[in-house]
Regions:
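Metalloprotease/metallohydrolase-associated module, dominated by Zn2+-dependent proteases
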Residues: 2-60, 125-220
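Short juxtamembrane and helix-loop transition motifs at transmembrane-helix boundaries
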Residues: 81-84, 106-114, 131-139
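Membrane-water interface of transmembrane alpha-helices
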Residues: 108-121, 191-194
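Perimembrane loop-to-helix junctions flanking transmembrane segments
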Residues: 62-83
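Generic, low-specificity signal for short hydrophobic/alpha-helical stretches with a mild N-terminal bias
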Residues: 74, 79, 86-87, 129, ...
Length: 220
């Protein structure tokens, strides 16, 4: 008789947060509702793609989309074929550059507030990141930290929709769609922060574990 043994892989322990500072309550684990955010990102993508697409159409006219589609007329019909070579490469470049700049802007604002910033790429999560691990971050500072990439890239890229060079205008359109859709997590954090009392602190242990420390002297 052959005896078979199976090793049970232990569950990964949640890293412990630091002790609460004087005047603060015990920490609470902050978690992203990943599935909900993925679902919300779909209509956000569609709304953003339509909104900036409409703006691009109004500024440049339909001719700008000739850089995206090859038009073939056959008899009484017109066929639009998406050129994956001319569109795919700029999209991939725009994706990586936008994500990298997005995180650099997060980090720039963190540094402005005197925080030590760690940049990196997490292949398991498929994400670039900028984080202030092992440091308390004030609620009031996290608003500009969270919104800086969304606002800055929108301000910088929107005027490029009017550049009379279709490849530049279309790339700017891609950047706007990617950046706005990718900010869904930032928008969720900002929404949560608005519901927290002034003086609240947040603390990143690692990429997956963030803790919230609320002050004890909160007036109800």
């Amino acid at each position: 008789m052959v005896e078979m043994k199976f090793a049970v892989r232990p569950e990964r322990e949640t890293p412990s947060p630091p002790a609460p500072p004087a005047g603060y309550d015990e920490p609470k684990l902050f978690e992203y509702p990943t599935l909900v955010l993925l679902l919300v990102s779909v209509p956000l993508f569609l709304l953003t793609a339509y909104g900036f697409g409409w703006l691009l159409w109004q500024i440049q006219g339909p001719e700008v989309f000739a850089t995206l589609f090859a038009v073939t007329e056959t008899g009484d019909s017109t066929v639009l074929v998406l050129d994956m070579i001319d569109v795919g490469l700029p999209f991939v470049v725009a994706l990586f550059v936008t994500v990298a700049v997005h995180e650099l802007l997060h980090g720039a604002v963190m540094r402005y507030y005197g925080q030590d910033v760690t940049y990196g790429v997490n292949l398991a999560m498929g994400a670039f990141y900028a984080a202030a691990f092992g440091q308390f971050q004030r609620r009031e500072q996290l608003f500009p930290i969270g919104l800086a990439p969304l606002v800055s890239i929108a301000i910088g890229a929107t005027p490029l929709l009017a550049v009379p060079v279709p490849s530049i205008a279309v790339t700017a359109y891609m950047v706007l769609v990617i950046n706005t859709t990718g900010a869904v997590g930032d928008l969720y954090v900002v929404w949560c922060l608005r519901r927290m009392p002034e003086g609240t602190l947040m603390y990143d242990v690692d990429l997956r574990h963030m803790y919230v420390f609320e002050p004890l002297d909160v007036e109800v």
